[in-house]
Amino acid sequence: MKQVFAVIKPNSKHREGVIEGKGGALVVYTKEPAIEGRANAAAIKLIAEHFEASRMSVNLIRGHASKYKVFEIYE
């Protein structure tokens, strides 16, 4: 199990994906809007793909209504 800090960039016009930012934080670009948890669901999917894990092994711990989030990944 590891915890990952991520910054979510919803409504991305140019791409969708995960890049490693400064200090080991992830920057997650998603085309989904930050409405009704759609950006959170897309971020979970993209982080799971980035770490080659299943979606069920990625949990949002902190930051449900913020662009700064902490995810827990069970491997």
Go through each PLM region and give its residues.
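Contiguous, often N-terminal, cationic amphipathic patches that form binding interfaces
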Residues: 1-37, 41-44, 53-55, 59-75
